[in-house]
């Protein structure tokens, strides 16, 4: 078993329901996001369309959770051993062991980690492993997305919804050239 995401960029409308649901589920501090929604310019603002006025303007949104990489550089650089990869592919932060040094934040090519100034430990998408471990097969971002842009499941199971979507639409890994082998397909 290997958990991962299929995110349909044609369905994402940039509403950030996934971000809000995640904040509420994990009781995150203000300004901490475990999943960011970026526009075409790679920013979290809503005022940067791409194209030419009047008929060619468009917005494309990219939800960016932790990529739960097969080769996670965050695990390699963590001096406390607080970041580790589970057998099911989920990259996890042990908040009790995290020393808040920020080395993993700097190493992540996806910008998927933040240090919470309140706690101060690293925050990142946990793929809602607390839900998955208890038999709830949906993450909060998947459950609440109004356009069903996010699908989570077992990438090793060809019959899973996530694997079927990737097979049907040929999902691409973002920043594949980083060599981390992300488990999120767009």
Locate each region found by the language model.
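Non-ligating segments of multi-cofactor redox enzymes
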Residues: 1-186
